[in-house]
Amino acid sequence: MHRAGGKRLWPAALALAWAATAGGAVAGTLDRIGHDKAIRIAFREDAPPFSYKEKSGAPTGFMVDLCRAVAKHLGDQLNLTEMTLAFLPVTAVDRFAAIASGKADLLCEPTTETLSRRQQVDFSIPTFVDGAGLLIRSDGPRSIKALAGRKIGVLAGTTTEDALQNTLKEAGIEAEVAPAKTHQEGLAMLDDGRISAYFADRSILIFLAQQSKAPEKLMLAENYLTVEPYALALPRGDEDFRLAVDRALSHIYRNGEIVAIFAKTFGGKAKPSGILETLYLIAALAD
């Protein structure tokens, strides 16, 4: 039993204390994190290289490692000597509900910020920028126009699914869109010849191609077909928490931590592109 001033806190008093800290109107996300010394991180198990599970089962990837760094900075802001990171697996379908319902504090995966999504959750300053493209078979069609009458795979419930439909419509191309439950399922469909191309963010496609049964038979189409600005999703309306997360990210960008996180994910000699360097320079807010 916890002691305060040498006196016991009996169950009734504990219940009242919990009610005061649990109410969203009384205590925000930062207060709860400080009270529990824990932060709840939602991540995807199937979105490498940004958010996925290692063979050991541990969450990893660029966004996961970035959120680990954010959590450390939040702990420093709250003067915590330790912080527990509780990871919650989510899918492309239920990820925003995990934040909106209060099950998780941060969504750490390749999340594209959009106006419609802002109706459900808030977003941090930008964390990455990517673009969607096509992973194709080297013996098949090599452009979006050449895919007329073919099957194109895409992850269901994502902005890339909407972008693919819009791209086909604007180009006047009739092709069958084959939704995949996971990127790995999409890769399997491409490997087996059930689809002629797989549509996703290019960084994800590069990683997927390396996992193919026959990577030498796959290639990336040249053109970017969309621009995807990533950010961390967090509870809507909690300005104090968003400010704390943005402060943490700004410090990570300014002190060079972001370069080490990037190198860990994309290879020891890999560095952020000129576009990403500019993004981090602009996004990092001064104290």
Where does each model-flagged region fall?
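Beta->alpha turn/N-cap motifs
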Residues: F43-A47, L88-V93, G102-T114, R137, ...
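Ligand-binding clefts/hinges and TM-proximal coupling segments of bilobed small-molecule sensing domains
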Residues: T29, D162-A178, E216-L218, L249-D287
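Extended ligand-binding regions for polar small-molecule ligands
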Residues: V64-H73, S138-P141, K145-T159, I206, ...
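Extracytoplasmic small-molecule ligand-binding "clamshell" domains
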Residues: G28-L107, N255
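Periplasmic-binding protein-like
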Residues: E45-D46, T127-S138, R202, A209-L249, ...
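Ligand-binding cleft/hinge of the Venus flytrap
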Residues: K55, R68-T84, T160-P179, A209-A214
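A ligand-binding cleft/hinge motif common to bilobed small-molecule-binding domains
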Residues: D94, C108-Q120, A163-E170, D191-D192, ...
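Acidic, polar ligand-binding/catalytic clefts
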Residues: R68, N79-A146, Y224, I282-A286
